[in-house]
């Protein structure tokens, strides 16, 4: 229901703002821009779905081989001690645990093209376990979606690449703040859902997991700081893609050992990928059109200016307001937030306070509404329950952490 209200609000707020701009400001092009944006967003939604078709077919084919070869079940057993606590509604050693593990691992490595199909496969398996209404999100679905929307990634290669292209003296100087901000976002997402689902977060396995993850991130930060920027990009890309292809070959070998017809198993999974891509089209178009209309009306500009005036009125520093477009756009549109980040770096400079803050915000979380539309749309979920509020709370935590860390690390820069 929350997503329904937000979607309606996109259109009604856009209409009110556009009408005010027409009547008061004399802007005769605003409604034309809104309509053009709705058409362009619908086209973009279809093109994204079309682009996902090949990737989904590839990875769901690979996942089917791994499932029949027993590799997914092996991953499920590996992740069971932690996931059984975070996802108590999933039976022990169920294949979906392995799919979730694969998805989160791919996200950590920044392998988006692999993570999305794995996540959609996990959603299909979670839907099979959904004992309630099939159009209503289950508890494990909500936990899975919120962790995904928090966007935990170990090495933000793309952001550092953009900073290098725009002339940053040290493109990797945002690595540590991004790591801390996205860890904060993920932690808040998990805590929010645990509170809603009354999951005891003080269980031994969970405490060991978060402690181990914190130690691992600390070690990675130490290693990162000892390497040059070019070495970081080289080694992280090499490691990620080598690991990914090793997993693919491991799946194939597992199928051979089980004496499967590996080719037929791949085709079976690839067919599921094609069907999934078709299923998500209307959900993706609905969300992207709503966001596009909201942006084109100029409503976001009014929000940003209102925040700037409010912050100034209470005597706080307003330097961070220059990055607000990226903060507000991030939950709505990944490409939009990326454009806002690049615009901030072009306008203020890649090494400016705003340029760095925009980069940190971009890496602090994922695109909530896109993730919700894509993943829930793939299994026909309409009632998302408290998914969106928890995910947006994580986005807010990530944004606050990004601002705080930028002041801490770069205010005197």
Language-model-detected regions and their locations in the chain:
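Hydrophobic alpha-helical segments, principally membrane-spanning helices and signal/leader peptides
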Residues: 36-39, 46, 95-97, 133-141, ...
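Signature of multi-pass transmembrane helix bundles
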Residues: 1-54, 161-295, 312-314, 386-413
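Short, amphipathic, aromatic/basic-enriched membrane-interface segments that mark the entry/exit
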Residues: 26-28, 88, 357, 361
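Membrane-embedded alpha-helical segments and adjacent helix-loop junctions characteristic
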Residues: 31-128, 258-347
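Short glycine/serine/threonine-biased micro-segments
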Residues: 12, 59, 68, 108, ...
